[in-house]
Curated annotation (Swiss-Prot):
Mg(2+) binds at E80, D82, D198. InterPro entries: Mab-21-like_nuc_Trfase, Mab-21_HhH/H2TH-like, MAB21L/cGLR. The gene is cGLR. This is Cyclic GMP-AMP synthase-like receptor. SMART domains: Mab-21. It catalyses: GTP + ATP = 2',3'-cGAMP + 2 diphosphate; GTP + ATP = pppGp(2'-5')A + diphosphate; pppGp(2'-5')A = 2',3'-cGAMP + diphosphate. PANTHER family: CELL FATE DETERMINING PROTEIN MAB21-RELATED, CYCLIC GMP-AMP SYNTHASE-LIKE PROTEIN-RELATED. GTP binds at D198. GO terms for molecular function: 2',3'-cyclic GMP-AMP synthase activity; ATP binding; double-stranded DNA binding; GTP binding; metal ion binding; RNA binding. Its cofactor is Mg(2+); Mn(2+). Disulfide bonds: none annotated. Keywords: ATP-binding, GTP-binding, Immunity, Innate immunity, Magnesium, Manganese, Metal-binding, Nucleotide-binding, Nucleotidyltransferase, RNA-binding, Transferase. The lineage of its organism: Eukaryota, Metazoa, Ecdysozoa, Arthropoda, Hexapoda. Mn(2+) binds at L288, D294. Nucleotidyltransferase that catalyzes the formation of cyclic GMP-AMP (2',3'-cGAMP) from ATP and GTP and plays a key role in innate immunity. Acts as a key sensor of double-stranded RNA (dsRNA), the presence of dsRNA in the cytoplasm being a danger signal that triggers the immune responses. Directly binds dsRNA, activating the nucleotidyltransferase activity, leading to synthesis of 2',3'-cGAMP, a second messenger that binds to and activates Sting, thereby triggering the immune response via activation of the NF-kappa-B transcription factor.
Amino acid sequence: MNGDEQNKKKLRSDAMFGKINQFVTLQKDETAKYNSLFTKVTESIVSILKEKDEVFKKYYRNTMYAGSFYKQTRVGQPKEFDLNLILCLPDIDSVKIEKGRPGFAKIKFDERKISSVWTEHKVLNKWLDSEGYLDNGKLRGWFEGMVKKSLNPSEKNSNKFRIYSKDSSSPLCEAEIKKSGPAFTLIVNDGSMEFAVDLVPVLEFSQSPPLSNFEKLKEPWHLVPKPLKNGDVPNQNWRYCFYHYEKEMLKKNGKVKPIIRHIKKLRDTQNWSILASYYIETLFFHVLSKNDFDQNESQTRLLVYMLKELSKAFKSGLLNYFWDKTFNLFGELTEDQIVGVQNRLDKIIKEIEADPTTMTQYFLTKEEQKKLKEIEEKEKTQPKKEVNVDKTNGLSSTFPLIRETKSEKNKKIIQESENRETSKNEIKALKEMVLSLKAEFKDFKNSIKQKPIDQTPETEGTDEKEMKKLLLLLINEVKQLKLNVGRLETKIDQTNEQIKNIKSQSTFFDVMETGVPLLN
């Protein structure tokens, strides 16, 4: 057995992956608490902006909840939320989208055909430059001023203000305004928890962007007014945003999400600040698009595979933006920054391949490692738990079932979901058989009508007998098929109930990773 085969054998078990996952996965109760307050804050803020500013009220269309939290790739507490406020400007459906800088586009209006509002309105008439391009700096400046003015800090010379819910005169929480890039960040605090909300104005489009590798889907895409400091006409360039497409890609390949979260956890523990979350996700987009991700492998082996892909990207100094290969996301990183992370990463990969039990010392902080040891010591004093058998590779995990229930539940949910889909497909096939039999009977009936009438005694009544025989056969077949359909529908109901029972004990991401919708 060569070295590669030995390493693969060592990486079959997901025991260490499961241990680390305890410190990565968001808990359902905690997530619900943050999400509840965030939803109320969102409703309140949008309501205030619409009430205070006529331009926003007229051109605001809806809200897009974005970011790693809604992609289910978030690590740690849900303390950051992205809130994209979609604006629908006059004549936006007839604009020309032109190529801008790599990763960016320009929005060109035909000044001969645009509505008079662009020249007559005291706000909008400032947003187009002399060439008819929408100026992202001007729109962003309006947005920032509008937010500051509308939210109206409770005290002078303060960026803090109170947020009220619709149904109460008591403050829901307090928020503070901070500026960061194209976003306006609100630091929300209700006394028991704190999180950040990035407010970003975005424009929505349904026409195809000027990108060669773009495959049109049903969902729209967006442009964001990201500020640029240098280069030609920076205010004409708008950053692409394909959030719906990226979310769908991850949804179709659910097994990648925990691996993305583990790499983000490694980054946080190792303090690799140069490795943005979006860079990690982009690496996965490239691998998924090439079908290089074998989801039948253990998560540990897939994790090591993706760490090696990350190392390759660092060595080449190249990580292309998935939607525009001319844009290198690593372009602004220095060689010293890249080399330092790459050397450390290569050492970690080598150590894990040699001994997977070393994973915890790289992925977990000292405090988390200590907590894990306490958990393991406590388990030693308790009655022996059932050992979780990893059905994907036939090996028993050395990690007790009590700590692998999340993974096991996901497997059960996926299996029951697959059973449900199989039953649905069987029902579909049976119904198609019924339709086929009906069509066959109809064709036979038509053929009888088209035959010349034979008046000889020998053949008289033969066609009627054949039709009755076929009709009887059809009736019996339909009865049997209906019985089968009923049996399968009962089986689906039972499967739904089993999934519901499993989910009632699951964490937020245990459910969401499977892609199985919550059942009422």
